[in-house]
Amino acid sequence: MERAIKNFLSQESAGGILLMVAVALAMILANSPLAGVYQGFLATEVQLRVGDLDIDKPLLLWINDGLMALFFLLIGLEVKRELLEGALSSVAKASLPSIAAIGGMVFPALFYLAFNYATPETQVGWAIPAATDIAFALGIMALLGNRVPVALKVFLLALAIIDDLGVIVIIALFYSTDLSMTSLVIAAVSIVLMVALNKKGVSSILPYGLLGFILWVAVLKSGVHATLAGVIIAFCIPLRAKDGTSPSEHLEHKLHPWSTFMILPVFAFANAGLSLTNMTLDSFAEPITLGIIMGLLLGKPIGVLLFSYLAVKLKLAELPPGIGWRHIIPVAVMCGIGFTMSVFIASLAFEHSPAAYGDYARLGILTGSLLAALIGYFWLAKVLPETGEKHETH
């Protein structure tokens, strides 16, 4: 189990660095003479047609609806494993990161709404600062090497996974529109068949993959966001087969490199290209921008810390062995690195809004996430010992 966690953390760390490169490249292209080529490439129409089935979308939406469904499939597999056998498999293990994650979602949303109370049309973005980017956060933490206690990394990992689960619920409840009953019925039948396969002990991934594709198309056409299909598929794939092997973990290990080194960097490259042409210092004072920055930079750490502190004081949870509040505080700041998931929610929230809203959101996400990364890194570096020695609680 410890080796699996270390492998996961090392991949996520490398992914965080690759994400930064993808963001930088997108920003350079969006603000260069090649900006038109960059935008035109993302707007390229891509069509999939089989009989009466016709899916015709710009490349950007194929990335956001298709590739990100695979990313959410991976998140679903991780959540299921952690719930059944890992860091969230008991009340004692799950209490602190679960309670901390709730605070880390509630407070950023409140901060955002506080800055957008006078503009109802922008309030739809309340969930944007509620997310934590697991790859970026672990990537920043990894820069400190073995100075970081494994228990602290696992705490951040568990908190971020629960955070992702919360984001999935938010997307399902608040960002699904114009529902098609026919598509929902097809989706329901697909789910029932996958559950039946699970109950029958079918461990081959192929039938789940075929039914999963049907589910993805049905959800895509239903008005519910297509990425949720990935999570549903994950929860239907058995964790343990009759012969003791784990189809779920096998698929998770297969997907991890693709997610880390292809899916998330491609998503970042496609969504982070913020043109600064029309941006001024006044852009930072826009309610959307300010709400997101304050939500990520203040709302996240305040929520995580306050709820963690109350949970410990009320004896609902305990700090991990060898970990003190001086460690938790900078990690709470790092939770404000919301990049990938925040950009994704922003693309849903402002899908039918003026383009400027999306630009302000990306400006807020990039600024807030960068500041959270820098402050969290230097703060954690200051409280950790110079070498990977024994960590004492203070």
UniProtKB/Swiss-Prot annotation:
Family annotation (InterPro entries): Na/H_antiporter_dom_sf, NhaA
Membrane topology label: Multi-pass membrane protein
One GO-annotated biological process of the protein: regulation of pH
Known catalytic reactions: Na(+)(in) + 2 H(+)(out) = Na(+)(out) + 2 H(+)(in)
Keywords on record: Antiport, Cell inner membrane, Cell membrane, Ion transport, Membrane, Sodium, Sodium transport, Transmembrane, Transmembrane helix, Transport
Domain of life assignment: Bacteria
Major subcellular location class: membrane
Record's subcellular location: Cell inner membrane
UniProt record similarity statement: Belongs to the NhaA Na(+)/H(+) (TC 2.A.33) antiporter family.
Molecular function terms from GO: sodium:proton antiporter activity
Annotated Gene3D superfamilies: Na+/H+ antiporter like domain (1.20.1530.10)
UniProt organism field: Shewanella frigidimarina (strain NCIMB 400)
Lineage of the organism: Bacteria, Pseudomonadati, Pseudomonadota, Gammaproteobacteria, Alteromonadales
This protein's GO CC annotations: plasma membrane
Name listed for the protein in its UniProt record: Na(+)/H(+) antiporter NhaA
TM stretches of this protein: 17-37, 59-79, 95-115, 124-144, 154-174, 177-197, 213-233, 261-281, 287-307, 328-348, 363-383
Role, per record: Na(+)/H(+) antiporter that extrudes sodium in exchange for external protons.
